[in-house]
Regions:
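H/E-rich (His + Asp/Glu) clusters that bind or coordinate divalent metals
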Residues: 241-268, 281-282, 292
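Short, solvent-exposed loop/turn segments at secondary-structure boundaries
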Residues: 46-51, 126, 177-180, 211, ...
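N-terminal pre-domain/capping segments
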Residues: 2-142, 160-167, 172, 221, ...
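Extracytoplasmic/secreted envelope proteins and their assembly/folding machinery
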Residues: 59, 132, 152, 183-187, ...
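Active-site-adjacent beta->alpha loops and helix N-cap segments on the catalytic face
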Residues: 149-158
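Acidic/histidine-rich catalytic cores of soluble enzymes
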Residues: 159-245, 249-252
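Active-site beta-loop-alpha junctions enriched in small/polar residues
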Residues: 40-42, 73-75, 117-120, 148, ...
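Substrate-binding clefts and catalytic carboxylate motifs of secreted carbohydrate-active enzymes
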Residues: 269, 273-274, 286
Length: 292
């Protein structure tokens, strides 16, 4: 039986059993709005010497920040290898490896809401298949993808076979018709598959001169989660939160007032004065104050 978008909201966004089970461990929900981060925010933190991934570093950082729900950035799970060696790693690493990583996060009280895979044209079909298998092994029902419309078409049979949702992440490049940036590009993706959704980057959307508040209000059933950053309009720079033109507070209040089950995740990209942990803490505090 096919699942409608409204059914998807009720089942996935309202809280899958895993998320509900973990809610009492690290709870980063404020007045009904579920806050978190993409682990890309911690990309500058050094890995543990000898480690092939950044999982332990991520867990320590998330615990310090009091974050209980995340989008897991796939490069954090991978050894740093040349492209062809990384392809071999993707194809040969057993799913038990990813299940073990999932358990590490679960044991730390952190729920994996989404898994980032930035699909590119050079991904083979075997790599696409493995990416969806990895998401399932990690317990993530959503893959968040920075990709292109031309690549999205290739993802349709994989998403539908695995019943894993792919949430398209946009940027501010409105000149390239193959890039996700504005409402029209997202509409084209949604028309491709019932398993396609939107991971709206509120900062990039604002920098591309679109109205994030109106878009969320009109499309909330199709939005899985938000990436929050504070950019200026006209493709302007990333700024410390509160110094740009992105309506972060208004977006958060919309989620709170309308009770939309859309996650709000920090994506730390501006040039901060502290460590990534310091800056993510500042962003989390900003959101908590906005929702108080």
């Amino acid at each position: 039986m096919s699942m409608t978008r409204r059914d998807f909201v009720k089942t996935s966004f309202a809280g899958l059993p895993l998320y509900a089970a973990l809610a009492g461990k690290i709870d980063s929900t404020v007045n009904g709005v579920r806050l978190g981060t993409i682990t890309y925010s911690f990309r500058e933190l050094p890995r543990t010497p000898g480690a092939l991934d950044a999982v332990d570093v991520d867990i320590k950082a998330l615990t310090e920040c009091g974050i209980g729900e995340i989008e897991l950035f796939s490069p954090d799970l991978q050894p740093r290898l040349p492209r062809e060696d990384l392809r071999k790693w993707r194809l040969s690493t057993p799913m038990e490896h990813f299940k073990a990583l999932r358990k590490k996060f679960e044991d730390a009280g952190i729920a994996l809401f989404a898994y980032t895979v930035n699909f590119r044209n050079d991904f083979t079909d075997d790599e696409l298949e493995k990416s969806f298998e990895q998401a399932k092994a990690l317990g993530a029902s959503i893959i968040a993808a920075s990709t292109q419309l031309s690549v999205a078409r290739r993802l349709v049979p994989f998403a539908e076979r695995h019943k894993v949702y792919v949430a398209m992440h946009g940027h501010s490049n409105v000149q390239d018709p193959d890039e996700f940036s504005g409402p029209e590009s997202f509409s084209r993706a949604l028309a491709m598959s019932k398993y396609f959704r939107i991971n709206l980057d509120v900062g990039h959307f604002t920098a591309a001169n679109f109205d994030a508040v109106t878009f969320i209000r009109d499309n909330h059933d199709n939005i899985t989660h938000l990436h929050l950053k504070d950019r200026k309009k006209n493709d302007g720079p990333n700024m410390p939160w509160g110094e740009g033109e992105t309506p972060i507070k208004q977006v958060l209040l919309l989620l709170k007032e309308r009770k939309y089950p859309i996650r709000a995740f920090v994506e730390y990209e501006y040039r901060g004065t502290g460590t990534p942990i310091d800056e993510v803490k500042r962003c989390m505090s900003y959101m908590r104050r906005a929702l108080a």
